[in-house]
């Protein structure tokens, strides 16, 4: 079952960085972090200080230099990178397992997915990308802080994060639910 296109749901193909964007700051293969770009923001690390204002207007993937001459790369937040940089508030699934879940459940664009247990949001962001642009992920977590923290990913406009038990909230879902993933 594939849903009709919903005009208010669009993937953003804007490849330049602007204020409010989530950016993955890549120092080296084992040193990355997610940063929300803000007007007064600064990232400081062993390579120098990097002003967020220097990032705006640059394309994702750019190499930017700090005031000491060091550099970092500014990467777009894909689900794969998000899984590597997110705060592990719970045990998470990694890309190999996520790929198997999505394939096994035949999750494709247009599906509606119910996820019970948002956790750190690793699976949620990959599910949201898999169902985009016409599908939707409804995810529930009983822990309020985990549900709130998971909302910041780039794919959050394809997901609804709720703080409560899914059984208590099932009545608020549309009657077009296609896939249920635990």
Q: For each predicted feature, which ranges?
A:
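Terminal, basic amphipathic appendages of nucleotide-handling enzymes
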Residues: 65-89, 97
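Conserved SAM-binding loop of SAM-dependent methyltransferases across substrates and taxa
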Residues: 120-133
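N-terminal auxiliary segments of SAM/dcSAM-dependent transferases
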Residues: 1-76
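Conserved SAM-binding loop and adjacent beta-strand
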Residues: 3, 12-15, 85-99
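S-adenosyl-L-methionine
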Residues: 140-182
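Conserved class I S-adenosyl-L-methionine
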Residues: 108-119, 138
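Conserved alpha-helix/loop element of class I SAM-dependent methyltransferases that forms part
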Residues: 92-112
């Amino acid at each position: 079952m594939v849903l009709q296109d919903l005009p208010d749901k669009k993937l953003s193909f804007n490849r330049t960085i602007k204020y409010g964007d989530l950016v993955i700051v890549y120092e080296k293969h084992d040193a990355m972090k997610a940063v929300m770009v803000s007007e007064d923001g600064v990232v400081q690390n062993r390579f120098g200080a990097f002003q967020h204002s220097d990032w705006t207007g640059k394309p994702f993937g750019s190499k930017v230099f700090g005031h000491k001459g060091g550099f970092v790369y500014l990467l777009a937040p894909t689900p794969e990178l998000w899984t590597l940089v997110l705060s592990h508030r719970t045990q998470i699934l990694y890309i190999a397992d996520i790929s198997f879940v999505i394939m096994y459940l035949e999750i494709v664009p247009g599906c509606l997915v119910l996820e019970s247990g948002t956790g750190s949001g690793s699976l949620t962001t990959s599910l949201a990308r898999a169902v985009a642009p016409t599908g939707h992920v409804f995810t529930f977590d009983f822990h309020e802080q985990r549900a709130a923290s998971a909302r910041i990913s780039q794919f959050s406009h394809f997901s609804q994060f709720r703080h409560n038990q899914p059984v208590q909230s099932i009545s608020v879902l549309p009657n077009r639910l296609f896939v249920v993933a635990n």
